[in-house]
Amino acid sequence: MQNNSLNLSLPEDFRGVHIHFVGIKGTGMAALVEILFHKGAVITGSDVSERFYTDEVLERLGLKALPFGAANITDDVQYVIYSSAYKLDKNPDLIEAVRRGLPCLIYTQ
């Protein structure tokens, strides 16, 4: 499976840009979500159902982690950022994002 992040440039202005996070409850991911949310990005994300302390961070922003599923990748999603805990060819969100040709960036990028 191809990673669609080669030669990717993110916008300088995140207002209205829809970014989906796979593994949104991770410590680093939640911090990035918070930054991009305050820059005006539209945020969705998926993760396991287990409760983590980062759920409180997400809830303060009015966000909730969705269960993994291809349906999370709607027509509005413009970028996908994912945790290294998930693989492009194994996670249903990522499989759908790649199928649609969306830019997929691993969190560390």
What are these regions (language model features)?
Residues 1-108:
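N-terminal leader/targeting and accessory segments in enzymes
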